[in-house]
Amino acid sequence: MSESLSGKWALVTGASAGIGRATVLALVEAGAKVLATGRRKAELETLAKQCSAQAVEVIAGDLNDAAFVAELAARAGNVDIMVSNAGVLTYAPLMDMTFDETEEMFRTNVLASYRVTHAVAKAMMERRRGHIIVMTSIAAREVYRLGVIYCATKHALSAIARGLRIELQDYGIKVTEIAPGMVDTDIRATSNHPRVLEALKVRKFSPLTPQEVADAVVYAARAERNCCPDLVELRPLGSA
């Protein structure tokens, strides 16, 4: 029997759109209450209105802002599940990437993710329970053309997730990586580089949907108390 999420309190970052938004909806459907955060307040409020009364609370802000993260951690309180999902992506050849684009990806995908996870994990350690779910990527285990910097950020985030799993297990805290392949989200459409557009045209498979990834999050969150799904990899059929 899998664990019920009824009455569980979850925090989802990057919830304004894509995987984060789908994850909020999936967790609510499974019975959890969710604190959803992202940069776009209007989208978060629209998301909350789609859910049953008081199932979703929203707080908009930038995870790169230390003061906001402190406020978010205090608001999250005794959170049972944290889904660290916020991220950015720029597809381009390595030598065409600007330093600003590179810095933004490392700052958001690695440092901001770690900042909020660190704050929430501290509270979980005091209670000696909790589940941290980190959205990494197939890119955490590969390096591919047009996405080298993104791969580097996901390699770093995966290493942090694995380290947290080792250090937090003695406190009864689970850490799971969800590692999807290409997903049909806004983040995938952020580059107009000709080589990127051409590569997308010739692909021979359909990307995963945000809902498919969200279902994997719920699957991991519902694992039996003594079972920790360390890594859940998802690939579009035909993409291997």
Model-derived regions, located:
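Alpha-helical segment proximal to the catalytic Tyr-Lys
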Residues: K122, I166-Q169
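Conserved glycine-rich cofactor-binding loop
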Residues: W9, S16-A17
